[in-house]
């Protein structure tokens, strides 16, 4: 939770859950907690909990709760070298070097301003500052983690909101797709098999999302190739599009391209994997053709076979409590300057527009197109949603959804 206690719910069966957060010792101390990963970090057969921490205020150290086997946990991040202090959004564990243990990729979102010019992003990209880069940690033989970010070739500035791990070029090695916010380009790190990675985002894709949000990787057409969904913030209806689409500004778009970044558009991308050329995966963005290009202020895309027909369907959570991209709001703020703007900052923030919206769930039609299925599947909720996860919570053979 963000500056509120974390929650751990014990599944008692029959869709009944018990809050054991305090008794288990995982409630935390009101840090700005972001992503949570459950992983058996010490190979004892028990699930541990790794919680990423962001925000502007200390303490900002990630926490690792080791499972004691009796429904209690002991915080041990420092003992494992996992006490990162950057502004980490989410951590993903995977075996990038194929040595039989799990390593960690930490998606970092360093502090920035939404009005930061592209020339500063360009400068930061080449500054090679570890505190402003995603991080790669290699697990050592003794179970501790060592930072190998620079040695692996991924010391780059970015505003990461998510990272998806998959073998995108079918060479048996796990690669990394990093979704970055604002003008900072995404990264597609291909695993070279020697402990290093090479960014191939421009070679592999024609364009990406502008406000890169959540991602998920899956084979949507059962051709044996891993595809990728990346969500952005484009609304379906014309009114909300015009009110909230910053990238409708041509000057902003071309300043991004001319700064050496990628072609980025404020729409979702569904990257269909068409195979490889000399080891580089080639993607075609089919989001519009597939019917999934605009899902409003989206956060978490999840591919899963919700109707058990053999094809991966798509769930997308969306919503924002305050619409900080609203063009009309910005015009109002720009009329006020200097000390007056500072004095009225709280009042202005409270006046930001807000509009609850529905999540999206799409049925995979089996032909690389999707159909919205909210009503057919009785999954409509008008509100403000962020994270989501799926699993068979009642052991009935189908997938259930938890939405924050």
Where are these regions (language model features)?
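Acidic, glycine/proline-rich Ca2+-coordinating loop motifs
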Residues: 1-404
């Amino acid at each position: 939770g963000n500056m509120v206690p974390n929650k751990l719910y014990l599944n008692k069966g029959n869709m009944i859950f018990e809050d054991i957060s305090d008794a288990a010792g995982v409630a935390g101390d009101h840090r700005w907690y972001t992503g949570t990963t459950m992983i058996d970090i010490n190979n004892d057969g028990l699930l541990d909990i790794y919680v990423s921490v962001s925000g502007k205020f200390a303490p900002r150290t990630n926490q690792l709760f080791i499972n004691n086997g009796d429904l209690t946990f002991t915080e041990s991040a420092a003992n494992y070298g996992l006490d990162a202090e950057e502004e980490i959004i989410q951590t993903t564990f995977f075996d990038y070097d194929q040595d039989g243990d799990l390593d960690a990729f930490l998606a970092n979102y360093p502090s920035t301003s939404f009005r930061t010019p592209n020339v500063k992003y360009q400068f930061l990209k080449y500054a090679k500052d570890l505190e402003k880069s995603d991080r790669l940690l290699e697990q050592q033989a003794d179970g501790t983690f060592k930072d190998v970010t620079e040695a692996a070739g991924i010391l780059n500035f970015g505003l990461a909101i998510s990272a998806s791990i998959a073998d995108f070029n079918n060479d048996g090695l796990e690669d990394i797709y990093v979704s970055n916010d604002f003008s900072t380009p995404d990264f597609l790190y291909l695993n070279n098999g020697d402990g290093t990675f090479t960014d191939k985002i421009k070679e592999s894709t024609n364009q990406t999302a502008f406000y890169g949000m959540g991602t998920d990787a899956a084979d949507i057409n059962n051709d044996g190739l891993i595809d990728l969904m990346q969500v952005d913030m484009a609304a379906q209806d014309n009114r909300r599009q015009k009110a909230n689409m910053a990238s409708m500004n041509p000057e902003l778009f071309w300043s991004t391209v001319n700064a050496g970044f990628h072609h980025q558009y404020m729409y979702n991308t569904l990257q269909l994997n068409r195979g490889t050329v000399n080891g580089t995966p080639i993607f075609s963005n089919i989001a519009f053709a597939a019917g999934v290009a605009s899902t409003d202020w989206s956060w978490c895309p999840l591919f899963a076979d919700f109707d058990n027909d053999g094809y991966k369907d798509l769930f997308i959570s969306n919503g924002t409590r305050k619409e900080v991209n609203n063009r009309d709001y910005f015009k109002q703020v720009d009329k006020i300057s200097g000390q007056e703007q500072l004095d009225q900052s709280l009042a202005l923030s409270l006046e930001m527009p807000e509009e609850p919206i529905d999540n999206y769930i799409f049925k995979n039609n089996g032909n690389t197109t999707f159909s919205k299925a909210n009503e057919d599947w009785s999954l409509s909720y008008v509100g403000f949603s962020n994270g989501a996860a799926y699993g068979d919570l009642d052991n009935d053979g189908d997938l259930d959804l938890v939405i924050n």
